[in-house]
A protein has these predicted regions:
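Short, conserved alpha-helix that lines the donor NDP-sugar binding/gating region
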Residues: 40, 44
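RNase H catalytic domain
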Residues: 8-12, 45-116
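Acidic, His- and aromatic-enriched active-site or binding-groove loops in soluble protein domains
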Residues: 121
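RNase H-like nuclease fold core
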Residues: 1-38, 49-53
């Protein structure tokens, strides 16, 4: 099962996340101040929580942030400001069979498409 995740940050409204499962968008907006990287991490955490809530197994989490994917997989250094997100992910790991987190191009990230649709002009 593929689960797409993406986070965004807007100066006026703050952070937002989107997760796409089975073609359905799960969007959270107004998540307060933070950075674009915080938003990407929150999107991954949202995706893992949602997979557990939906009872999904053998999931692959797909996001377009190389930094977050690398930090989550332990293949990239996690900056001090984001260690709390890595710890939150580790706490969620028992909810999932295994955490398979992979990078996908931005143009292929269905969650990114969902966020972009929110702000079409």
């Amino acid at each position: 099962m593929k689960i797409f995740f993406d986070g965004g940050w807007r100066p006026a409204s703050g952070m937002e996340t989107a997760v796409v499962v089975h073609g359905r968008d799960y969007v959270r907006q107004g998540l307060g101040p933070g950075s674009a990287m915080d938003a990407e991490w929150l999107a991954l955490l949202h995706a893992v929580e949602l997979a557990a809530d939906l009872g999904l197994h053998e999931t692959v989490f797909l996001g377009d942030s190389l930094a977050v994917v690398g930090q989550a997989n332990g293949t990239a250094r996690c900056p001090r400001d984001h260690v709390r997100h890595r710890q939150a992910l580790a706490a969620l790991q028992p909810l999932s069979d295994s955490l398979r987190i992979h990078h996908v191009k931005r143009s292929q990230n269905l969650a990114g498409v969902a966020l972009a649709r929110l702000h079409e002009r």
